[in-house]
A protein has these predicted regions:
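Cytosolic regulatory regions of ion transport systems
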Residues: 1-99
Length: 99
């Protein structure tokens, strides 16, 4: 499955690791470039630096082609907006969770 995760906190990072271990195609969107670079090197994930509620970032991550979109930043508004945008852009399943 093609899965997009927004947010690379403790839970987001653990989720990415588990999804990669299960052989999913994982795309990570994270605001902090240094965190994104570290995780992209450690795990087999494609990364996009930026705000998950930004339409252009979601377009770059090809949200319209994802099977599952999971927003799990520490900001409720980013989680809600990004999940709604992802659904409108064609994501098959969306989920938002506060970490």
């Amino acid at each position: 499955m093609r899965i997009i995760v927004v947010g690379a906190g403790k839970v987001g990072t653990a989720l990415c690791r588990s999804l990669v271990e299960e052989k999913h195609d994982v795309i990570l969107i994270e605001e902090k470039e240094e965190v994104l670079k570290r995780l992209s090197k450690r795990y087999d994930v494609m990364g996009f630096a930026g705000n998950g509620a930004n339409f252009k970032i979601l377009e770059q991550a090809e949200v319209s082609n994802c099977d599952v979109f999971i927003a799990m930043t520490d900001k409720d508004e980013v989680n809600m907006i990004s999940a709604v945008l992802a659904k409108q852009m064609g994501a098959k399943e969306t989920n938002c969770s506060r970490t």
